[in-house]
């Protein structure tokens, strides 16, 4: 690992450009040609993510510092939520993964920041394999079906957004996504109990996967099945939380107050990215910014309910992808790692064209944020503070615009009853 963060981030930027070029150049030109098999695809996913994770001595500064506070408290036997004062806005699951990686770093000499990134890299590799397996299961068992599955899996293996979140930022979104995508896959395989357990673990890791629960419940055939699935999916996080509170004789407020109300930061996504900084220049706009922040939960709830109703005749995967798009489209608060949510489910739903365009726009936002705020703040050296702030805030508008257009297209397809998955020409002809 480099000790010079400036040199490391500069070389990491070159690596990002190379991987993004591979992502852009990847095309399903000939689905009858030779495409790599799944072991090679998984190897590509690992080799794309490991170099920057190994040579970068930094991640997103606030997050890595928070992980260190959490693991120090956990390994010293202290109650984490009381000890770190709001720095872990999650339920008690990922902290134990972090604790295990911190102990690994201490015993092997592996740099702490590298150890914190490894679970997300492994989860990303596993997600790549899941995408391949799920797509090939839904396609013909000949070479064309394999080629289409390989293409979609490679779009994740080479995806700049997943690369930035796991290997640069150091966030663990991929772990949550693997559990949630696994829950969907088990649901597709008619294994509702295993599906509910996987979804429960995803909710325990980060609370936002609870959005998947109504999608499944609406598609179960009886009230008994609905209650059983819900009880298992919610029972797992409830039991773990209760066990943690009892074990430490802890006050639930520090844990639940953050985990159940965390909504990201306003002013970096959608209309709030323009309105919040503009209110600093023109104070007359501040009341409008305050109203937008005050209504954020109502807007989120309304968008989610509308998406659930609109997609009730679609498959669980199509409905969930549209639901995620609706939530991301209207949210006021935002975390840059949330940009990864859409990509694995878009590829599982075979929305390759939209996933490609969105990934490039989202990677632009992530790069500007990571190189402007969270790693070595290069932008602060090149631009004045107001210009850097405006650039960082407005960098999300291209990705947000893609989300809006994508959502509109999916809502129209749902209304018309058209299939959401793309049909490659070679497969459509057969």
Can you say where each PLM-predicted feature lies in the sequence?
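Multi-pass membrane glycosyltransferase architecture that uses lipid-linked
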Residues: 1-257, 264-266, 293-430
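Membrane-lumen/periplasm interface segments of multi-pass, membrane-embedded glycan/lipid transferases
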Residues: 258-298
